[in-house]
Curated annotation (Swiss-Prot):
Belongs to the PNP synthase family. This is Pyridoxine 5'-phosphate synthase. GO terms for biological process: pyridoxine biosynthetic process. GO terms for molecular function: pyridoxine 5'-phosphate synthase activity. It comes from Ectopseudomonas mendocina (strain ymp). Its EC number is 2.6.99.2.
Length: 248
């Protein structure tokens, strides 16, 4: 496999913590899940420290920062607290995401175009802390161009609408939007990642898009792990997207 069609897998372990928080126990441990994921071939570990702390906790992030052998992709809202926290932890990668307390999960991309000054200031702070910053955005030209203007070196395209498509035609349309977004991002010199709602039956089509650097996948892996074990679930997803990227 050449660098041109190499693809990375970021494993999101948020929902291991969701299961733990459901009963307020100390198990299952998302840190152990992260280490198992690395052993199974994950190229990075993604965690989202939400304002309401519904799954990942501050301590999880601190421990992960010390023990990960790959790299952390730290998802966070654009708040003063989170910026300060990231400056302390200094994760390798930070992905800025939109966040509201009422949402079940992240519902859409960050509106970079509508708040360029605020996002640019956050990108600058995080970059000075040694973090590579990506912006979680919809596959829209105006948002991609805004991401470039604010100084982010990378974007993560929101694949939720593709994942939630009700018909094959709708899925094809959304996949086309993602493909166009990848091309646009690459043309603007950005690293292009993608994620949200991807699983074992829909990730291949996204992985096959030329130029995709990394897919971030979590819920599907955690769910599949209930039946096959965490390492096996990660290994299967890694093999699936690598094969798709090679064919694509």
């Amino acid at each position: 496999m050449t660098e041109a069609n190499r693809i990375l897998l970021g494993v999101n372990i948020d929902h291991v913590a969701t299961l733990r928080q459901a009963r307020g126990t100390r198990y299952p441990d998302p840190v152990k899940a992260a280490l198992d994921a690395e052993e199974a071939g994950a190229d990075g570990i993604t965690v989202h420290l939400r304002e309401d702390r519904r799954h990942i906790q501050d301590r999880d992030v601190r421990v992960l920062a010390d023990v990960l052998q790959t790299r952390m992709n730290f998802e966070m809202g654009v708040t003063d607290f989170m910026l300060g926290f990231a400056e302390q932890i200094r994760p390798a990668h930070v992905c800025l995401v939109p966040e509201t307390r009422q949402e079940l999960t992240t519902e859409g991309g960050l509106d970079v175009a509508g708040q360029e000054a605020r996002i640019a200031a956050a990108v600058e702070r995080l970059t000075l802390a040694g973090c590579e910053v990506s912006l979680f955005i919809d596959a829209e030209e105006r948002q991609i161009e805004a991401a470039m203007r604010v100084g982010a070196p990378a974007i993560e395209l929101h694949t939720g609408r593709y994942a939630d498509a009700h018909t094959a035609e709708e899925a094809a349309q959304e996949l086309s939007r993602i493909r166009d977004g990848v091309i646009c991002g690459l043309n603007h010199g950005l690293i292009v990642n993608a994620g949200h709602g991807l699983h074992y039956h829909n990730a291949e089509a996204v992985a096959a898009i030329p130029g995709i650097n990394e897919l971030n996948i979590g819920h599907a892996i955690v769910a599949h792990a209930l039946f096959v074990g965490f390492k096996q679930a990660v290994a299967e997803m890694k093999a699936l997207i690598v094969a798709a990227a090679y064919r694509g």
